[in-house]
């Protein structure tokens, strides 16, 4: 697979430059390129246009790592708009201020991020009534 960052390009520029590539092997990565990312300026709605052109999509997250809610929010919105890949930087020690440190998760934060998205995907993909729900329904006398 080839990952191409398309941040800052219009849909016409992307189509002109990458329209002839094998869409099953190219992932268009989008993320508002500023450190840290201002989620209010991120154009998540544009994912729908790219998806209609059958491109695989990814989200390059550069939100402030110390505010994990921003990363979770941005990545969740991207996934719900068609992103199947998430780029998130990791670092062993953010205090060393290496490149991209502002948006880099430390190990424990990254583990929590993975755990969150395992649950997130389970919630999105699950449409079966669980045994727990059936038991609750019966115990509460819900028989409409």
PLM feature segments, named:
Residues 1-144:
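Catalytic cores and adjacent flexible loops of soluble metabolic enzymes
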């Amino acid at each position: 697979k080839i990952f191409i960052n398309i941040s800052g390009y219009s849909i016409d520029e992307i189509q002109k430059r990458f329209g002839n590539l094998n869409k099953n092997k190219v992932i268009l990565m989008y993320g508002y390129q500023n450190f840290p990312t201002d989620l209010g300026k991120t154009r998540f709605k544009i994912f729908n246009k790219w998806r209609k052109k059958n491109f695989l999509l990814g989200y390059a997250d550069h939100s402030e790592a110390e505010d994990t809610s921003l990363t979770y929010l941005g990545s969740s919105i991207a996934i719900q708009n068609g992103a199947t890949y998430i780029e998130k930087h990791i670092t062993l020690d953010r205090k060393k201020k290496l490149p991209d440190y502002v948006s880099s998760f430390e190990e424990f934060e990254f583990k929590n991020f993975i755990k969150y998205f395992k649950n997130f995907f389970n919630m999105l993909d699950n449409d079966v009534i669980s045994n727990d729900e059936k038991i609750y329904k019966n115990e509460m006398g819900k028989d409409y």
